[in-house]
Structures are given as structure tokens and as C-alpha cells.
């Protein structure tokens, strides 16, 4: 009662696609999979926090969080299973499609929406700090 079923279904679809991207990353290499898993875990943290509202409290929040975690894990395993024997071209194409979808979402939806709120210099600092952290992780894991 009071839960937006359409929003929850879309969230599960989004998280499933994120899981497939993580699985494709692990099929490419362990390093790629780890970088994608770390990067997308930040997105999933904020997605989970955004799902919590006044209409959803208590055990429903816990249940939704567990089901989202199972969703991303299951799709990661499926992506890795089906792409483990695939060639580099197929994996690269799937990763390119996934990255293009993520970039489209960021540029078309999130950046436009972000500029409707007053921007603070600390927000920009945290954005660039996040990029530097993930870039450093990739550099040091090589």
C-alpha cells in the first residue's frame, strides 16, 4: 500500500542492467569488473537511499534493499556466465553499449535536473574527487 510499483519495477530493471554491465566487466577482466562494481556501487547506494520515502518504512525498506542486492548479484553472475567464453569484440560491444546508456542518462537526465538546484562549490569538489578516486583505483590496480 502506498508503494509506487512502476518506479520499483523500473528500478529493478535498471539495477539488473547494471548487474549485466558488471558481469560483462568481469568477463573482460577482473580489474574491469572491480572498477565497474565499485563505480556502480556508489550509484546503487544513492539509488537505494532515493527509494526510501515516507510511504515505505521498516521491513519494506529492508526487503527492497535485499531484493535489489539479489537482483544486481544475479544479473552480474548471469552476465559473467554468458559472456565468459565470448570474444573481446562481443564483450567490448556490450560494455560500449552499457557505457553509452549510462552517459546518456547522466547527460540527458541528471545534469539537466541537477542545474535546477542551486549549485555549491563543494558539490563540484566532491564530483571531481570521486573521479580522481576511481581513476586512482584503476591506475594502482594495473
Residue ranges of each PLM-predicted region?
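Intrinsically disordered, metal-sensing/regulatory segments
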Residues: 1-142
Amino acid at each position: 500500500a502506498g508503494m509506487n510499483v512502476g518506479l520499483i519495477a523500473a528500478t529493478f530493471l535498471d539495477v539488473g542492467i547494471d548487474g549485466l554491465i558488471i558481469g560483462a566487466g568481469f568477463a573482460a577482466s577482473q580489474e574491469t569488473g572491480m572498477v565497474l562494481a565499485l563505480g556502480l556501487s556508489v550509484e546503487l547506494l544513492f539509488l537505494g537511499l532515493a527509494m526510501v520515502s515516507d510511504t515505505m518504512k521498516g521491513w519494506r525498506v529492508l526487503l527492497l534493499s535485499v531484493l535489489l542486492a539479489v537482483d544486481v548479484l544475479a544479473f552480474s553472475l548471469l552476465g559473467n556466465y554468458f559472456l565468459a567464453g565470448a570474444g573481446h569484440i562481443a564483450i567490448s560491444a556490450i560494455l560500449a553499449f552499457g557505457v553509452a546508456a549510462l552517459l546518456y542518462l547522466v547527460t540527458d537526465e541528471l545534469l539537466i535536473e541537477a542545474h535546477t538546484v542551486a549549485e555549491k562549490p563543494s558539490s563540484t569538489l566532491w564530483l571531481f574527487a570521486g573521479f580522481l578516486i576511481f581513476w586512482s583505483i584503476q591506475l594502482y590496480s594495473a
